[in-house]
Amino acid sequence: LRMSRGLGDVYKRQEEHISDVLEGNPTPACDVEEATLECMRHPIGSRPLQEIVRKGDKVCIVCADITRTWNHSDQFVIHIVNELNRAEIPDSDICILFAQGTHRAQTPEEDIRVVGKEVASRIKLYQHDCKNKDELVHVGDTKLGTPVWINKHAVDADKVIVVDGITTHLFAGYGGGRKLILPGVAGDESIQINHCNALGTEFGSGINPATRSTLLDHNPVSDDMQEASDMIKPCFLVHSIVNADGQICRMVGGDPYEAWLEGTKLVYRIQKVPMKQEADVGFACAGGYPKDVSLYQGSKCYDPADVAVKDGGIIIAIMEASDIQEPPAYLNSFQYETEADMERALRHHFTIPFFVAFNLFSVSYTHLRAHETCADLV
């Protein structure tokens, strides 16, 4: 199983006690440079990138941060920059804005890990701080009432390109696409109000059932994000898709919505796995670095594991969690004794780390209620 930057072992005593080993469908790795150029020159729902930008444009590449390096953006951002150069956009007219959402600032070494050494040495790099109001511009409100505050580097650019990878997401259905704008380069108020839609409309209803992994239709979190992204009007998208071995197997590019949506369909086909039966015990792998960089990031693996384990069963998560800079809102949220107490506090002051903890708490309570004798073990 993947743990940190390597592999960890789980020892099994008797084969007949193993119900199933669930892995993504085998998909060969691709030639990243070739696939990136192909998706920019023969895009989905869009003209080629070179025909969209023009000499004199100031281009902002909004790029996912260090917590998303599983997307291997360091392997393909260079090809985007060079393609812009071929369209007569010099390095001096290009900047990269890291879509950090509410995450911490990156170190210079982490910047290099995200975009590669050459890009980091050639292109202006900006860190997004969701709480720095001097860096934010109000561009409107969504139909759900979310005030949309966006980083000025994205707002002031002539062209915005969104760069990430696509995988499933805990409550937005899928990551990537519109998430590069909200929450990626949005203000803290915008992010928290948007993410509140992950809860049901009334106290006691818990998590909104429409805001689950792989769900996009009528998902209020995703729809709200898309509306906010449309206010910025990114001109192009370049996203990677990785296989079960963590290698890039596809690149999608083109219209920021249509190309992303096509990418989500590819992800579903690659990651969907058949399951013989629900298990009594499930070992859940967080996916290795950077997905297991912290308890906060790694605990998201409980959600898919919950589907594979019987109510009252046991989920054992395997992760390294080497980054001790856990969000305080995540660690402090486990002080509540009941799910109701936790939900009440979350509705009063919603934060993303708090929600992730609440989701974990809800999963745990589902199993503990069904089999209370597991309490001491858990």
Identify the residue ranges that each predicted region occupies:
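Histidine-anchored nucleotide/phosphate-binding helix
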Residues: W70-I89, C301-A308
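Conserved phosphate- and dinucleotide-binding cores of soluble alpha/beta proteins
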Residues: I150-V155, V160-V238, N243
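Membrane-embedded hairpin module used as a gating/binding unit in multi-pass transport
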Residues: G206-Y289
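Conserved small/polar residues in nucleotide/adenosyl-binding loops
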Residues: G6-Q14, T366-T373
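Short glycine-rich or small-residue beta-strand-to-loop segments that form or flank ligand, phosphate
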Residues: K58-W70, C95-T102, F283-C285
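Short internal beta-strands
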Residues: D93-G101, I316-M319, R369
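An acidic, phosphate/nucleotide-engaging active-site surface
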Residues: A105-G175
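C-terminal catalytic subdomain
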Residues: D292-Y365
